[in-house]
């Protein structure tokens, strides 16, 4: 009687036992616990709640996919650069979970009308959201490029700054479009053009790196990065000057101080009004300007790039 051999397929368990693999497992667990607790409380209705839920669920799903791909050892079959994609997503994971961790309690935890048990679940969910954010921060610190190391561009400081720049731009779009603050003056429309152009170019850089398409550029990649960073610094510097003038100067129809109707709102300790959004755009413009300046400095010093 012939001997039958059974083939046992064993995945790459070493990736799960590595420090990065362990951190990713914790990210999946923490994110799952977070959105499960929030769903249990039922306190996540509305656009802000949907946004927070999307952040936790999206991070959970993509991290789980990354774990499965690395466990199966099929990174080379994926249509993306595996030297760039995981670190890019990890950085987005930091920013998304951090935003949800800050926004959710401000919107839903202040309402004391709900019973203490529901609030306790919310507090625990916020704690696990903090842990999820911390786990992504650790992953970024473990996988980012070390001094002298030649790796994917997105693992370098300029690559991580690109992620930060696009995320901040997305937040600016939220504040500037509801209501359409830029329609107050043509100069503010210029600021909107600055945010859009720089956002699109940063996204293009990320897509080129993750998709391994940098060879499509008609010029050297490092020269393109330095030129774009310089252009972005100049454009954001102009927006940093123009936006506060036309948003807060009375001569141009602005409001220099917070209106009385913005003081408070029912059910919340703090109400975000249109004037607050103008301030938020000004602050985020300054933050992104600093990010682009750092990007320019690092891009000028970055000599060896492997995508």
Swiss-Prot record:
Cell compartment(s), UniProt: Membrane
Membrane protein topology class: Multi-pass membrane protein
One GO cellular component term noted in the UniProt record for this chain: membrane
TM helices/strands, residue ranges: 19-39, 54-74, 85-105, 123-143, 156-176, 190-210, 228-248, 278-298
Encoding gene per record: myadm
One Pfam family named in its UniProt record: MARVEL
Family indicated by similarity: Belongs to the MAL family.
Domain MARVEL: start-end pairs: 15-148, 153-304
Disulfide bonds: none
Keywords: Membrane, Repeat, Transmembrane, Transmembrane helix
Protein name: Myeloid-associated differentiation marker homolog
Cross-referenced InterPro entries: Marvel, MYADM-like
Broad class of where this protein is predominantly found: membrane
Superkingdom classification of source: Eukaryota
